[in-house]
C-alpha cells in the first residue's frame, strides 16, 4: 500500500467543525416552566432538617404556673398543632424538652434522667424566670435550682413570669430556624456542654431553729429564746395572782 503524497492530513479546524456539526454544541440545558414547578433541587441535609423542624415532639416538664400558659396553646385560639408539635409522655419518643417552672434539688436527678433518655438530636427550651434564674422562689430558698442550665444544656431561653403564649410561639419559630441551619457533618463534632449562664448559688448559713428542745420548754417561744424564761415565769405569777383575786371576789 502506497501513500498518496498529494493527499494532506485534515487540519484541526476541520476536525473541530466536523465534530460540532455531528455532535452539536454542549451548552446549558433549558428548564421548561412545567419542569421547574415539579422538580426541587436540594440536598439530603436540608431535606432531613426540613422534616425534623416540621415535627418537633415536645416532652412537657411543668412544675409551676408557667405550664398553664403552655396549656393555653392546646386550645383552638392558638392551635399549636400547625407547627407540628405533638406532646409526648415518654422521653424516648420526644426530641424537645420544655422545662416550665421551678426546679428543686429533689427533682433535679429526675430531670437529668429524662434528658438522658431522649434520643439525639434533642433540644431544650427553658421557659420562665424560675427555670432560667430560679425566680422569686430562690430568694431565700435552699432547695431551688438557680438555673436549669446547671443541670442540662439549654438551646433557647424564654424569659417571662409567665411568658405569654405568643412568646412561646416565637421561641418555637426560633428553634425551627436553628434546626434548619444545622449540619449533619458538624453535629458529631460539636457537643453541647453545660454553659452556666445563670447566677451562682450563694447560700446563707442559717442556724437550725427547731432543735428538739421545745418539747422540754414551757413554750416554743422559750425554746427559741431561752433568755425569755425569767420574764415568762414572772408574767405567769402575775397572771395567777390576778386570777386568784378575781376568784376570791
Swiss-Prot record:
User: What keywords would UniProt list here?
Assistant: 4Fe-4S, Iron, Iron-sulfur, Membrane, Metal-binding, NAD, NADP, Plastoquinone, Quinone, Thylakoid, Translocase, Transport
Per UniProt, [4Fe-4S] cluster binds at 65-66, 130, 161
Q: Does the keyword NAD apply?
A: yes
NCBIfam families in alphabetical order: nuoB_fam, PRK06411.1
Q: Which family does it belong to?
A: Belongs to the complex I 20 kDa subunit family.
Q: What does this protein do?
A: NDH-1 shuttles electrons from an unknown electron donor, via FMN and iron-sulfur (Fe-S) centers, to quinones in the respiratory and/or the photosynthetic chain. The immediate electron acceptor for the enzyme in this species is believed to be plastoquinone. Couples the redox reaction to proton translocation, and thus conserves the redox energy in a proton gradient. Cyanobacterial NDH-1 also plays a role in inorganic carbon-concentration.
What is this protein's record name?
A: NAD(P)H-quinone oxidoreductase subunit K
> What organism does the record attribute this protein to?
Prochlorococcus marinus (strain NATL1A)
Gene name, per UniProt, is ndhK
Amino acid at each position: 500500500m502506497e501513500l498518496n503524497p498529494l493527499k494532506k492530513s485534515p487540519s484541526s479546524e476541520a476536525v473541530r467543525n466536523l465534530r460540532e456539526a455531528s455532535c452539536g454544541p454542549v451548552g446549558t440545558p433549558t428548564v421548561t416552566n412545567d419542569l421547574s414547578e415539579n422538580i426541587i433541587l436540594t440536598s439530603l441535609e436540608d431535606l432531613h432538617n426540613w422534616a425534623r423542624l416540621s415535627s418537633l415532639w415536645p416532652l412537657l416538664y411543668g412544675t409551676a404556673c408557667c405550664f398553664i400558659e403552655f396549656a393555653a396553646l392546646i386550645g383552638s385560639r392558638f392551635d399549636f398543632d400547625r407547627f407540628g408539635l405533638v406532646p409526648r409522655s415518654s422521653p424516648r419518643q420526644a426530641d424537645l424538652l420544655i422545662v416550665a417552672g421551678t426546679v428543686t434539688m429533689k427533682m433535679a436527678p429526675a430531670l437529668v434522667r429524662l434528658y438522658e433518655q431522649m434520643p439525639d438530636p434533642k433540644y431544650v427550651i427553658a421557659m420562665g424566670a424560675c427555670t432560667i434564674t430560679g425566680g422569686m422562689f430562690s430568694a431565700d430558698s435552699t432547695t431551688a435550682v438557680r438555673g436549669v442550665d446547671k443541670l442540662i444544656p439549654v438551646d433557647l431561653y424564654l424569659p417571662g413570669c409567665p411568658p405569654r403564649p405568643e412568646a412561646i410561639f416565637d421561641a418555637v419559630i426560633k428553634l425551627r430556624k436553628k434546626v434548619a441551619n444545622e449540619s449533619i457533618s458538624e453535629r458529631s463534632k460539636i457537643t453541647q456542654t453545660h454553659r452556666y449562664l445563670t447566677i451562682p448559688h450563694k447560700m446563707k448559713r442559717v442556724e437550725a431553729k427547731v432543735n428538739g428542745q421545745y418539747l422540754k420548754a414551757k413554750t416554743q417561744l422559750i425554746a427559741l429564746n431561752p433568755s425569755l424564761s425569767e420574764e415568762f415565769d414572772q408574767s405567769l405569777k402575775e397572771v395567777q395572782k390576778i386570777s386568784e383575786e378575781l376568784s376570791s371576789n
